[in-house]
Amino acid sequence: YKRQLVDRIVPGFPRKDIAAIKEKLQYDDNMVVQAEIFHLWVIEAPQEVAAEFPADKAGLNVLFVPSEAPYHERKVTLLNGPHTVLSPVAYLSGINIVRDACQHPVVGKFIHKVMFEELMETLNLPKAELEKFAHDVLERFNNPFVDHQVTSIMLNSFPKYQTRDLPGLKTYLERKGKLPEGLVLGLAAIITYYKGGVRADGAEIVPNDAQEIMDLLKQLWATGDTAKVTEGVLGATFIWGEDLNLIPGLAEAVKKNLDSIQEKGMLETVKAIL
C-alpha cells in the first residue's frame, strides 16, 4: 500500500512478568512481546482493496481511507510528540514509567499543558475530535497493565523531537506569536539528559543516539557553559536541517531552562511554567 499508519504502544519484552507468563503458558517463549489492547491500522486505499483484503472484518481495527495524512498528523503530534518531551522531564524528575509521569502532581500537569494547550493548538482538525483523541491517548498512557519505561522512548530523542515536536513549536510560534513553554522545556530536558551522569537517587542517565550527536553533546557539555551548549545544539544543522538559533527567542528560552534545571532541578523548573 502506498501509505499506511500503525498505532499501538508496544513496550517490548515483559522482563518483570516473564516467569509468571511462562508458568501460565506452560512452555518457554522468549519471544513474548507486551503490548496494549488498543490498536489501529490505517490504510490509504480505495474500497476495492478493502473487499480484497477485508482485515476490518476479522475483528481488527483496520480503516481503509482516502487519505492517511490526517490520521498520521494527529497521532504523531498528540501521541508521539508528548511521549518525546515527557520522557526526559519524567526521568530527570525521578520517574521511570509513563503511567507514573501522568499521575504525578507536577509532571502530569506538564503533559496536559503540552498536549491540550500547545500541540493541539497547531492542528487543523475539529477541536472536539482532537480533545477526544487526546483524552484517549492519556487513558492509554495511564494503562495499569503496561509499565512503559520512559528510557525506552528516549532512544534517538533529537531526531524524534525534530519530526514530532519541532513542527508544532514553529506552528505555535507562528499562530500565537510566542514560544510554547512546554515544548521548549522538553527540548532543554533532552539536552540535559544527554549530559549523562546520575540522578539524585543514584540511577544512571545513559543517553543513546547516533554517535555524531553523542560526540557533539559530550563536547558541548564539557565546556560547562550553557550558552555554548544551547548555541551548539540549536546550530547543529545535521540534526535539524536548519539553524534553530534563527528562531526568535528560542536560544534564550532554552538556555534559561538549562540554567534552571542545573540550579533548581527539573521539578522546580516545570512548576515555573504551570
Q: Residue spans of the language-model regions?
A:
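Substrate/ligand-engaging "lid" and interaction regions
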Residues: 2-274
